[in-house]
Amino acid sequence: RDSSSSDASTRLLKEIGVDIFSLNDVDEIDFYIDGADEISNDLSLIKGGGGAHTNEKIIASASKNFLCIADESKMVDELGRFPIPVEVLSQARSFVARKLMALGGTPRLRHGFLTDQGNEILDLSGIRVDDPISLEMEINSIPGVVDNGIFGLRKADQIFIG
């Protein structure tokens, strides 16, 4: 049995006959396999270029093993060259943007895009990610933030570069 982190992936998998289950139907997942936008040496990640990072983080957190597959261009010494996606409630977008600017970053609305949960994404650039766990928690503590694309608390267990 398989699960998917986005509505688009679920549709594609069902088209080829893969039986998809809900995370609500299982206690845990043995393996979660996905890519990343950036990977640091300590296996922290930035994910969410496709806008599904909240669901991806939920599934990764419910998985015994999180395997990340990427090409060498995704490996970085320090996270933050790729914008950090921040999923926000629409009514809090401007408030969250001001708070992100106070952290030293530049948020930009991902125009014309809504997440599978119907929320907006602010792509945050220009901010140093010296401590992925602290920044992940600091961004998530802003009222109106659903989640962000830093995977510091739930890092990948293994990286496969190909």
What residue spans do the PLM features occupy?
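Conserved phosphate- and dinucleotide-binding cores of soluble alpha/beta proteins
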Residues: 10-162
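Divalent-metal-activated hydrolytic enzyme cores
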Residues: 6-7
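Short active-site oxyanion
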Residues: 1-2, 44
